[in-house]
Amino acid sequence: MINNSILNAACFGYSQTRRDSYFEFILTTCVDVYYAIINSSEEVINNETSIRDIFLKYLQCLAFKKKYKLRNLKFDPETLENRGRADIRVLPAKDDYIDDEAYYLIECKRLNSKNLTGECGLNAEYVINGICRFASNYYSSHFGCNAMFGFVVE
C-alpha cells in the first residue's frame, strides 16, 4: 500500500514557489495579450467590462492558448466570490486540476491617467474595490496569490 502523504505535492518544500511561478507565467502571457490588443485594429472603449472581455476573448481562444501554452487553463468572467464578483477566474485544468475552489483571481479596474492622487474617482476605486478586497480576504485566495489589472484610461 502506498502512503498518500508521500504523494501529496503540498508537502514538497517548493510547491508554493512552483504555484507562484506558474501564476507569473500566466500574468506574463497577459502582457502578450495586451500587446496583441494594441497591435490589433480592435476598438477599445472606456468601460472596464468591455476591456476585460477583450482580454478574455484572447485568453479563451484555442489558437492563442496553443501558441502560449495555456491549454490547461480555463478563464472565466465574473466569478462569484464570498461577497462579490471577481473579474477573471483562472482555473488550472487537466494535470494541474485540484478542485473547483483551487483557482487564481484577476481583478480589473480602470485607472485615470489625469487624476493621479488616488483619493477619489477611478484610482480610489482601484485601491478600495480592488487591492483592499484581496487584503481583507473579501476575495478568496486558495494559492495565496492573485492579481490586479489596471487599465489606464483618459
Residue ranges of each PLM-predicted region?
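Short, well-structured alpha-helical interface segments that form or flank functional binding sites
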Residues: 46, 50, 54, 83, ...
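Secondary-structure boundary elements
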Residues: 61-65, 95-98, 139-143
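Glycine-rich, often proline-containing surface loops adjacent to acidic residues and nearby aromatics
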Residues: 28-36, 104-107, 145-149
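Short, well-ordered amphipathic alpha-helices
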Residues: 55-60, 88-92, 135
